[in-house]
């Protein structure tokens, strides 16, 4: 039987601060509590932790609903056009289209800022044409964007 503790700080393997978790007694007694990462759960702390978790779930549900609305908006706008310099043949790009380029195009067309690190380009975009990229908006909410790469000029 484990020991119930309330985390005082975020612990990668257990959860976020304020979370009620059950761990092995030795782990709690010898590591988590002495390091100041957790405290032994008392009835008052358990009640407070449950209240915080309910609040966190409520806030997360609101963020998820907002993210789903944003996804719908982004996907409804159709193609996002990117203009890039091309070589002699008219198809081969100088360089590639990057996550930053996609983020800037989305911001200018949709007015929605997406962190470039949340944009996934499956294969390097080195030619003009139509491509699909994914933008992670919130945890597991991912928008699929269609990108039209055209020659600049």
Curated annotation (Swiss-Prot):
Pfam families: Ribosomal_L9_C, Ribosomal_L9_N. InterPro entries: Ribosomal_bL9, Ribosomal_bL9/RNase_H1_N, Ribosomal_bL9_bac/chp, Ribosomal_bL9_C, Ribosomal_bL9_C_sf, Ribosomal_bL9_N, Ribosomal_bL9_N_sf. It comes from the Bacteria. PROSITE patterns: RIBOSOMAL_L9 (PS00651). Keywords: Ribonucleoprotein, Ribosomal protein, RNA-binding, rRNA-binding. GO terms for molecular function: rRNA binding; structural constituent of ribosome. GO terms for cellular component: cytosolic large ribosomal subunit. GO terms for biological process: translation. Belongs to the bacterial ribosomal protein bL9 family. Binds to the 23S rRNA. This is Large ribosomal subunit protein bL9. It comes from Gloeobacter violaceus (strain ATCC 29082 / PCC 7421). The gene is rplI.
């Amino acid at each position: 039987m484990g020991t119930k503790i309330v985390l005082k700080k975020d612990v990668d393997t257990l959860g976020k601060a304020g979370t009620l978790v059950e761990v092995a007694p030795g782990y709690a007694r010898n590591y988590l509590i002495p390091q100041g990462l957790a405290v032994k759960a008392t009835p008052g702390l358990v009640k407070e932790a449950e209240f915080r978790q309910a609040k966190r779930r409520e806030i997360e549900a609101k963020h998820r609903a907002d993210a789903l609305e944003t996804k719908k908006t982004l996907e409804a706008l159709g193609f996002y056009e990117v203009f890039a310099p091309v070589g002699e043949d008219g198809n081969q790009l100088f360089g590639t289209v990057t996550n930053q380029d996609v983020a800037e195009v989305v911001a200018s067309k949709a007015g929605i800022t997406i962190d470039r690190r949340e944009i996934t380009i499956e294969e390097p975009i080195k030619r003009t044409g139509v491509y699909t990229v994914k933008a992670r908006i919130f945890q597991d909410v991912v928008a699929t964007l269609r990108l039209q790469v055209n020659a600049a000029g």
